[in-house]
């Protein structure tokens, strides 16, 4: 499958599947995975980028291990809402991944996710060296948590309307 919208996620997930969040960096891929209730994002170890074929193999194995049904990928928009070069790189990554997996990708605006992740790690008194190792997975968790919160609000609005 190609890409999907956040509203489609509940229909795309099979029982027992989770949602993954990705934060693409130039040197690492941050990964986070939801719980089965789609309430909480849990950071996973970062994937050190080597070359695409290896990166894809490692990522797909991690997604299989966590029984992922949908991939939420951070779209690094500029602060003014325009698409910059990193947006193009993210879209290219998804296009290259699509032939390798049937999992749908959902783009999610990730503005300020890395800033929020760094502040959270500083607040937890994580040393500068360890922050560098964890920042992309923490950012992936922020991206995913934002999407999970949106899904929760959508479910609540559907319940209130019904």
UniProtKB/Swiss-Prot annotation:
Alphabetized UniProt keyword annotations: Cytoplasm, Hydrolase, Nuclease, Ribosome biogenesis
Family: Belongs to the YqgF nuclease family.
GO annotations of cellular component type: cytosol
Native species: Brucella abortus (strain 2308)
Reported function: Could be a nuclease involved in processing of the 5'-end of pre-16S rRNA.
Molecular-function GO term, any one: nuclease activity
Keyword Hydrolase appears in the UniProt entry: yes
E.C. code: 3.1.-.-
InterPro entries: RNaseH-like_sf, YqgF, YqgF/RNaseH-like_dom, YqgF/RNaseH-like_dom_sf
Name assigned to this protein: Putative pre-16S rRNA nuclease
Location in or out of the cell: Cytoplasm
Lineage: Bacteria, Pseudomonadati, Pseudomonadota, Alphaproteobacteria, Hyphomicrobiales
């Amino acid at each position: 499958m190609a890409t999907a919208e956040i509203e489609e996620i509940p229909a795309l997930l099979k029982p027992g599947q989770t949602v993954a969040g990705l934060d693409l960096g130039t040197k690492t891929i941050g990964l986070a995975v939801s719980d089965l209730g789609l309430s909480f994002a849990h950071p996973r170890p970062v994937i050190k980028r080597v070359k695409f074929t290896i990166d894809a193999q490692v990522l797909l194995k991690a997604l299989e291990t966590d029984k992922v049904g949908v991939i939420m990928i951070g779209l690094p928009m500029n602060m003014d809402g325009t698409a910059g070069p990193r947006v193009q790189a993210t879209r290219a990554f998804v296009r290259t991944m699509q032939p390798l997996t049937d999992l749908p990708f959902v783009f999610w605006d990730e503005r300020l996710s890395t800033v929020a992740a760094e502040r959270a790690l500083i607040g937890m008194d994580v040393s500068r060296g360890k922050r560098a190792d964890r920042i992309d997975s923490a950012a992936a968790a922020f991206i995913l948590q934002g999407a999970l919160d949106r899904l929760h609000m959508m479910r609540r609005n559907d319940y209130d309307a019904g």
